[in-house]
């Protein structure tokens, strides 16, 4: 059975790249009737925080990504990691390295001065017992390093990239698998070792992650072999790039799922877009689909090797499509909390009125957040912008508004009645209909742009806001 995992580190909020990796893993599991599980990699004690774990889990749930088992907490498995390191030490496949940080820095500086790539020179690979005893007598602590054969050619078949090979000589020398500790102890186990141990313990069959892990995969394959563990298959997906073609990072501003959510993007649009970041849907499917629909056809043959450039226009288009498809009641459920957060008084408005407002605004929305500013004139009396003020100075504009105002009563307007009042006021002031309509929009909305005027007027009339605004505009 296919079993895949997402293994986020809770050192920050859910990044869009991590979320895209989650989407690909989830799609692959669902396509093959397998399981999608989580592992929280919280071994960075200083930076890992429970609030980040909560943010990651909440973000996945919001996107519609569910998991099939309780999340594994990596820090609770340290003893299993140390047992694996001890196994490698006992087999002579790992050793203790007493090189100090100062010595290692000097080594790297000398290499760079000679225009060589920095790497560990394996200086403590074959220490004698006497040499080890001397270092211990000095009070030196030791890391644990895994032996890497420079002549080894590491090969695997990548589900995205095909045949892959990596030279052992390009892995930077013998790899540290445990932090510095007294020589009779094993320090904190490090990433490449713990990932291998945990993936094997969790029966992971496919490791799906970003291409920035390719070098790690070469190292991890050696560890799988040394520990006698079954190999998973690997798929390295393209990185998400910014508009300049560089890896998307915090310097680009919006990178976390929380940011997108706060800006008013919907979960379905964001999940839809992340699926398209590096995957091409089959011909005829189009670009608008749900995760469930994508799961029926997802495969790695359609995952691109090249980096996926983040396209804000496409995301905005998808989000607009989602919002336009929402019914008024559903859109109201999404917008009302935002209106209340903005300080709009919604409690005095009926559900029917709020839903009519949503129906009016819906077709013009790209983001949910757009619905706040577009709705503002329906809750707060706007000041007249310059274009509205200029319109009211047009010949006959104020006379027509006065005629219209005099015909209004406390009774709520109906559409046909409103049209008749407009016609009568135009005749009374001897102006063209366009003059009055623009002037009425300026008086009601504070500007000459906005949603359908007649529907806007009827909503404001129903809320008892139209006569006061017209009167105020007339001065």
Curated annotation (Swiss-Prot):
Sequence motif 'HIGH' region, residues: 8-18
Top enzyme category: ligase
InterPro entries: aa-tRNA-synth_I_cd-bd, aa-tRNA-synth_I_codon-bd_sub2, aa-tRNA-synth_I_CS, aa_tRNA-synth_I_cd-bd_sf, Glu-tRNA-ligase_bac/mito, Glu-tRNA-synth_I_codon-bd_sub1, Glu/Gln-tRNA-synth, Glu/Gln-tRNA-synth_Ib_cat-dom
GO biological process, one term: glutamyl-tRNA aminoacylation
GO cellular component terms, A-Z: cytosol
Catalytic activity: tRNA(Glu) + L-glutamate + ATP = L-glutamyl-tRNA(Glu) + AMP + diphosphate
Amino-acid positions noted as binding ATP in the UniProt annotation, renumbered to this chain: 250
GO molecular function, one term: tRNA binding
Keyword Nucleotide-binding set for record: yes
SUPFAM superfamilies, alphabetized: An anticodon-binding domain of class I aminoacyl-tRNA synthetases, Nucleotidylyl transferase
Enzyme Commission number(s) from the entry: 6.1.1.17
UniProt keywords, alphabetically: Aminoacyl-tRNA synthetase, ATP-binding, Cytoplasm, Ligase, Nucleotide-binding, Protein biosynthesis
Assembly and oligomerization: Monomer.
Function: Catalyzes the attachment of glutamate to tRNA(Glu) in a two-step reaction: glutamate is first activated by ATP to form Glu-AMP and then transferred to the acceptor end of tRNA(Glu).
The protein, known as: Glutamate--tRNA ligase
Species annotation: Synechococcus sp. (strain RCC307)
